[in-house]
């Protein structure tokens, strides 16, 4: 990071600091997708968003092009220094003699994807396939789904799996598949150093005075929110805090 993280945050009533894993991680891409979905309800005067992800400048450029996340709000660092300072979960750290640091990281990542040292990951993976009546519809009927191994198709296809009032079966899994294809197709851009593949992130919401209103530390892969059905539900703290300030 070459500029202050909180630069130009002075006029915002709240500051949301997102410490992301690798920019090519499932969690980073999915978190950015949710933020873009809610962007109109999160004007900069209401909440200043700053994200720090593991990668390079090239990683950050590709990430923003793909997700639509604002480049001005994204900071990248190559070695997870902030993650270590905040004591965020570094992931499973099984070591086997004879393996390089990179190969150790890959082994631990695969084990975490299988649920070892990563509580809730398998449950969250299955939720993406079976649907979730507590989550909103994710793909609009007229949206064209591209970037997966499947031929392009319209979002209305998911009507076959259920009504539009909630997350239908395979809907979230499709978004995750699209993210996976994007990352694997540009692996060395997104992940210039595989030593930090298992590093997890965290979420921190502050008011304008610097008081911490909410925090979440990721316990594992696909654990970037306390409520994965509604990952941004914690932003209700902003409304509650605004009412409190108004009554003061």
Please place each PLM-identified region on the residue numbering.
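N-terminal targeting signals for export/organelle localization
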Residues: 1, 236-248
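Short active-site neighborhood of thiol/selenol oxidoreductases, capturing the structured segment around
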Residues: 4-42, 48-52
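Short acidic, S/G/P-rich loop/turn micro-motifs used as interaction or catalytic elements
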Residues: 22-26, 57, 220-221
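Short, surface-exposed basic-aromatic patches at helix termini and helix-loop junctions that form
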Residues: 40-43, 63-69
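Thiol-based oxidoreductase modules, predominantly thioredoxin-like and allied folds used
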Residues: 44-59, 71-79
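Residues lining hydrophobic/aromatic ligand-binding pockets adjacent to catalytic sites
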Residues: 47, 200, 229
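Thiol/selenol-based redox catalytic cores and closely related redox-interacting motifs
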Residues: 77-220
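A short, polar/charged loop-to-alpha-helix boundary motif
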Residues: 219-241
């Amino acid at each position: 990071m070459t500029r202050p993280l909180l630069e130009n945050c002075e006029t915002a009533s709240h500051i949301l600091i997102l410490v992301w894993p690798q920019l090519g991680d499932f969690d980073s891409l999915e978190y950015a997708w949710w933020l873009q979905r809610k962007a109109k309800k999160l004007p900069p005067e209401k909440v200043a968003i700053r994200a720090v992800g593991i990668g390079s400048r090239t990683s950050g450029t590709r990430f923003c092009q793909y997700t639509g996340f604002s480049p001005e709000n994204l900071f990248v660092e190559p070695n997870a220094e902030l993650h270590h300072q905040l004591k965020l979960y570094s992931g499973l750290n099984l070591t086997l003699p004879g393996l390089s640091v990179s190969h150790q990281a890959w082994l631990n990542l695969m084990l975490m994807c299988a649920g070892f040292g990563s509580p809730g990951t398998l449950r969250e993976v299955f939720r993406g396939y079976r649907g979730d009546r507590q989550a909103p519809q994710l793909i609009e009927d007229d949206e064209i789904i591209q970037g997966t191994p499947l031929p392009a198709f319209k979002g209305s296809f998911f009507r076959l799996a259920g009504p539009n009032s909630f997350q239908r079966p395979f809907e979230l899994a499709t978004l995750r598949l699209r993210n996976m294809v994007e990352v694997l197709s540009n692996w060395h851009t997104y992940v210039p150093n595989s030593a930090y593949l298992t590093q997890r992130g965290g979420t921190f919401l502050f008011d304008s005075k610097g008081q911490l209103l909410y925090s979440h530390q990721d316990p594992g892969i696909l654990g970037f929110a306390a409520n994965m059905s509604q990952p941004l539900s914690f932003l209700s703290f902003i409304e509650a805090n605004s009412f409190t300030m108004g009554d003061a």
